[in-house]
UniProtKB/Swiss-Prot annotation:
Biased composition (Pro residues): 846-857
GO BP term (any one): RNA polymerase II transcription initiation surveillance
Function description: Component of the integrator complex, a multiprotein complex that terminates RNA polymerase II (Pol II) transcription in the promoter-proximal region of genes.
Protein name per Swiss-Prot or TrEMBL: Integrator complex subunit 6 homolog
Stretches with biased composition (Basic and acidic residues): 629-639
Regions annotated as coiled coil: none
SUPFAM superfamilies per the UniProt record, alphabetical: vWA-like
Subunit structure: Component of the Integrator complex. The core complex associates with protein phosphatase 2A subunits, to form the Integrator-PP2A (INTAC) complex.
Taxonomic classification: Eukaryota, Amoebozoa, Evosea, Eumycetozoa, Dictyostelia
Region of interest (Disordered), ranges: 454-515, 542-572, 629-801, 818-861, 946-1034
Length: 1107
């Protein structure tokens, strides 16, 4: 909605009221209150606000136009001043022209095609004035007139300056200047009231501020979309007869009444008051408000089914009261001169009471709808949607009798009613061409008139600016002359007579009081407007001039007085700086003067605060910005931030656990050359986020713990007799390819000599070459002393094409012994082994064997170990696989303390021979070949001494650490490029046979060897000692444990059955009862941390079943 405020800014609006405000200030308060209430409505986002004053200049009169925003509107309202004439007719004419500026271009008025009530641009104009005499620059205007702009006489086919969707509301301010308890009679009706009634608005008189606010609030109910129409009774002979028969009173007139329009598109227009003539060059003039004639004869209320119609509610008026009182249900409405023949025309709608009987609605149908209802009824009932030629002729005659602008909406309505194409397409083509040409002509004329207006206004604005600049120059010249005139007689006299100085001192106050009238001319006040803003400026300037004059007088008089008390009568008006110098006789007089002198400034400043206009009273942000900001309450509580370091650093909180690497703790103490220990700086500790429960370790589950390392030993071939062998091995950090080749040659010679001297039982001790010394204490080698025993086994002979290879298998029982210092490393074959300590492992007697674990699953149908698990290298870059049949390798377990891992073997070892003990008549040797063991991980199987590669991200919690003490072990050791395996009678069920196939491609094996060598190097740097067990399938058990812990950490309760099912599967694999209880207790502890009460109860019941 378009809301336009027209404010009277004449001189009479500056008169004061009883509340101390001027009438202009009251008008500003009314606008602000209107916007405050309107802002509570959601429809305000579609509103546009305009501001027009009563200035005679058409350019400067429009303060807020189409291009300005809402903030500019508020600011311009505050800046209004009373300095114009009260030519309200010109202001209203400008406001209507301003609203109608773009209506022709948007075709809202729809000239010559009927009036569409749903296609409107509703607008209201609110006039705020004092209702005094209307004046202009030349004389006083006796009658209020609203002329039409001369530029729109030919371009606008509307006879009035307003439209049927624009209304004028006026609030006349008749405030009293003197407060009185007597009720004064209301003044006579203002001259603006008839104009408000013509537009469908209303004129109201406000006698005080309270009634003005109430009237502003009442305007909010008028902000409804709709159009204004006039209703007149139809006068003819039939109407007179019906009125006489029914004894009805004469029907009333209802002029300029509101039809409330809903926000939806309609179908049927209200007909024009003329029939458009195609032969004419222009359209006839139309009235702003259509005049609708109504009949008092009762009519039929039948409407065909599925036929569209429009419905509008009529505001309460004398017509509605007449119909409701006489209970007239339905009457037809007509538009005069709407046909080619002048007269009342045919009905286009009806006035009908609603179902509740408390309001009247206007129903709009097609023109001459009674005839159309008959034709449609014949089409549906008689012809069954198959019209005859006679019906088509009658229907075509109906189309030619109605105004041509009804053809197009009727075509759309019949498509909804039936699927027949009853209206030809070319019946209204001539009318459409005529209307289009006429509308184009009207638009072009309006554009040219607007352009001419713009040029004329710009020229007038330039002339006014020139005149204003000349006036300012002339006023400045007059002010300079006035200042020179005032300064010449008011100069202080230089005569020494005290009387002249006293008289000037006495008259200083009166002179300062008249200073405003001397310096400010009344002509200038009239030109600028005598508003509250100018009053505040005058008071402020007068106060400054009076203060300056008094201070200058005080200083001049006090300088003439001496230190002696001024008791003479000539010094009565002199202010003393020292109160003790005042005589007793002058004390009372001086006391009054001192009071005025001290308190006068403060009183003037306080009074000047209350002389501000309303436009300056709302500047809260400027006032608050000038004040000193308050101290923050939380300044004392804020911590002192450091001025150094990283300003974006954030302290970590909720650190529950701190994990420290054991290698870091071991490296804190280092030995220097003199044998003294000194502390090294602590390394950065890694902080873990969430503390998970500690996992079971080997120390808490097994009674024995040993350190294990990858060792290199020479291979020996023993006969079928018991033999005790002590092997001492050591490992170094790294070796080159040349040293590895020399060591491989030596190993081949030693293997041949040992095989020739092994016919009788003997004991031998084999020691590796002295290694080189390592500088890093964390890379110290490990020396292990292993005592083994063998038992005779029936010998079998296996033929193999591969020679110079022997395999030694021994079952070893390992017991912890004392830790000895490592020997120096000087071997050419060295391995990076970051272990903390070295241990010597020996055993003289074997303890009773533990209960056998469940049998291992079969690897494949042929019981063949994949060739990728055993890698053989030679100098010819050929890696053949070694088939071994009918060998029952024992299960082996190598135990180590917690957080230790088995190191990989050197990547390049040649001339390796594999020896086997207790497997008689098996002697296979190979030349220039080596079997390289992969890095051993606790998460992979180790079957028959074959080690599978590990996963880099395998967790430390495995079943290998839990079953290390319940089975025998096999230690694969290598010395000088040979691999040996020993067994004892305490073995568990293993695979029945191992087949080595020698059918793989050499190139593929070479690639596998290179990849495994790379893995060895990476694992050598990332892994420490590993724990290996082959009593159970490690992958399956470890996956079960990880899955159970993951399910416990999930914040759900529907996975308890899955956890119990997986634990049952795990316990069916594990045969040790203590191991089961330990795993179950650790699972309960983890469930307690995550507060799984129902799961804990199930697990406790499971413990009772195991026990």
């Amino acid at each position: 909605m378009l809301i336009t405020f027209v404010v009277d800014t004449s001189g009479s609006m500056s008169q004061k009221t009883t509340n101390g405000m001027t009438l202009l200030d009251c008008s500003k308060a009314a606008i602000e209150h209107f916007i405050k209430i309107r802002s509570k409505d959601a429809s305000m986002r579609n509103d546009r606000f305009f501001l027009i004053t009563s200035e005679e200049n058409p350019i400067t009169a429009v303060k807020i136009g189409w291009k300005d925003n809402f903030n500019s509107f508020i600011q311009e309202v505050k800046n209004l001043q009373t300095k114009d004439m009260s030519n309200l007719g010109f202001s209203l004419q400008k406001s209507f022209d301003f609203l109608n500026q773009f209506r022709v271009q948007s075709s809202i008025d729809n000239y010559g095609q009927g009036r569409n009530p749903w296609f409107i641009e509703p607008a209201i104009i609110i006039l705020l004035t004092d209702g005094s005499s209307l004046t202009n620059s030349s004389s006083i205007i006796e009658n209020f007139t609203l002329p039409k702009t001369q530029f729109h006489l030919n371009s606008d086919p509307t006879s009035e300056p307003f439209r049927w969707d624009q209304r004028l509301f006026s609030i006349v301010l008749k405030f009293g200047g003197i407060s009185s308890n007597k009720s004064l009679p209301l003044p006579m009706e203002p001259a603006i009231a008839p104009m408000c009634d013509v537009t469908g608005g209303r004129c109201q008189v406000a006698t005080n501020m309270k009634t003005m606010i109430q009237q502003v609030e009442g305007l909010m109910q008028k902000l409804q979309g709709g159009v204004v129409v006039s209703f007149e009774p139809l006068v003819n002979q039939q109407q007179a007869q019906a009125q006489a028969q029914q004894l009805l009173p004469p029907p009333p007139l209802s002029l300029h009444k509101m039809l409330y329009v809903r926000q939806q598109v309609g179908f049927w227009p209200i007909p024009e008051g003329y029939y458009p003539d195609i032969t004419s060059l222009s359209l006839p003039m139309r009235l702003a408000h259509p005049v609708i004639r109504y009949s008092i004869i009762e009519a039929d209320t039948h409407i065909p089914e599925n036929f569209p119609f429009d419905k509008y509610e009529l505001e309460p008026c004398p017509l509605t009261q007449y119909l409701l009182t006489n209970k007239i249900q339905c009457t037809h409405v007509f538009m005069m001169n709407s046909l080619q023949v002048s007269g009342q025309g045919e009905p286009f709608g009806c006035l009908r009471l609603n179902s509740a009987g408390n309001s009247v609605n206007l129903f709009v149908f097609p023109y001459n709808f009674p005839r159309l209802w008959i034709l449609l009824e014949d089409l549906t009932t008689t012809f069954k949607m198959m019209p005859s030629q006679k019906w088509k002729q009658e229907f075509e005659g109906y189309l030619l009798s109605i105004p041509p602008y009804y053809i197009n909406p009727l075509r759309g309505a019949l498509k909804r009613f039936c699927s027949l194409n009853l209206i030809p397409d070319n019946i209204d083509s001539q009318f459409i061409n005529f209307i289009n040409n006429t509308i184009k002509k009207i638009k072009s004329q309006s554009i040219s008139k607007m352009e001419s207006e713009r040029i004329i206004n710009s020229k007038q604005q330039q002339q006014q600016q020139q005149q204003f600049s000349h006036q300012q120059q002339f006023q400045q010249f007059q002010q300079k002359q006035a200042q020179q005139y005032d300064s010449s007689p008011s100069s202080p006299s230089s005569s020494p007579s005290s009387s002249s100085s006293n008289t000037s001192g006495i008259g200083s106050s009166s002179g300062s009081g008249n200073l405003a009238t001397k310096k400010k001319s009344f002509h200038q006040i009239l030109d600028q407007g005598y508003s509250s803003d100018i009053l505040s400026e005058l008071i402020q300037q007068d106060n400054e001039t009076s203060e300056n004059s008094e201070l200058s007088q005080e200083l001049s008089e006090s300088s003439t007085t001496g230190s002696s008390g001024g008791g003479s009568s000539s010094n009565i008006n002199i202010l003393q700086r020292n109160v003790f110098d005042i005589g007793r006789v002058q004390l009372l007089n001086q006391l009054d003067k001192m009071k005025d002198h001290i308190f006068k400034k403060k009183i003037q400043k306080d009074e000047s605060k209350h002389h501000l206009p309303i436009s300056q009273m709302g500047n809260y942000h400027e006032t608050i910005g000038k004040r000193e900001t308050l101290r923050d309450i939380d300044d004392d509580k804020k911590p002192n931030t450091p001025l150094f370091g990283n300003p974006y650093r954030k302290e970590k909180s909720n650190q529950r656990y701190m994990s420290i690497d054991e290698a870091d703790e071991g490296g804190n103490l280092t030995s220097d050359g003199e044998g003294k220990n000194k502390l090294t700086p602590n390394k950065r500790r890694r902080l873990s986020g969430r503390g998970y429960p500690s996992l079971p370790t080997l120390n808490s589950l097994s009674n024995t713990s040993t350190t294990t390392s990858t060792t290199t030993t020479t291979t020996t071939t023993t006969p079928a007799t018991s033999t005790n062998t002590t092997i001492t091995s050591s490992s170094s950090s790294s070796s080159s390819s040349s040293s590895s080749s020399s060591s491989s040659s030596s190993s081949s010679s030693s293997s041949s000599s040992s095989s020739s001297s092994s016919s009788s039982s003997s004991s031998s001790t084999i020691t590796s070459s002295p290694p080189t010394t390592s500088t890093n204490p964390l890379l110290q080698p490990t020396t292990a002393s292993i005592t083994t025993s063998t038992v005779p086994i029936p010998s079998t002979t296996v033929s193999s094409p591969i020679t110079n290879t022997s395999i030694i298998t021994t079952n070893i029982h390992i017991q912890p012994t004392q830790i000895s210092s490592p020997p120096p490393l000087s071997s050419s074959l060295a391995i990076n082994q970051p272990t903390q300590t070295s241990s010597v492992i020996s055993s003289s007697s074997s303890p009773p064997p533990p209960p056998p674990p469940p049998p291992l699953p079969i690897v494949n149908n042929n019981n063949v170990i994949p060739s990728s698990l055993v890698q053989v290298t030679n100098n010819n870059n050929n890696i053949p696989t070694v088939p071994v049949n009918n060998i029952s390798p024992p299960t082996s377990t190598i135990s180590s303390p917690n957080n230790q891992h088995l190191l990989p073997t050197p990547p390049n070892i040649n001339n390796t021979s594999i020896s086997t003990t207790n497997v008689p008549n098996i002697s296979t040797t190979t030349s220039n070949e080596s079997i390289i063991s992969q890095p051993i991980s606790p998460t992979h199987k180790n079957i028959a001494g074959v080690v599978r590669p590990f996963r880099p991200n395998s967790p430390p919690l495995t079943i290998d650490t839990l079953t290390s003490s319940s089975s025998s072990s096999t230690i694969p050791t290598t010395t000088n490029g040979s691999l040996s395996t020993h067994d004892t009678p305490n073995t568990s069920p293993t695979l029945s046979s191992i087949n080595y196939n020698n059918n793989n491609n050499n190139n593929n094996n070479n690639n596998n060897n290179n990849n495994n060598n790379n893995n060895n190097n990476n694992n050598n740097n990332n892994r420490k000692n590993s724990i290996i067990t082959t009593t159970t399938p490690n992958n399956e058990t470890n996956n079960i444990i990880k899955f159970v812990h993951k399910e416990i950490r999930r914040p759900t309760k529907d996975n308890h059955d899955i956890i119990i099912q997986q634990l049952s599967k795990l316990f069916s694999i594990l045969s040790d009862g203590n191991l089961r209880l330990k795993l179950l207790k650790d699972t309960i502890n983890l469930a307690k941390e995550y507060k799984k009460s129902s799961l804990i109860s199930k697990l406790i019941g499971y413990i009772d079943q195991i026990k």
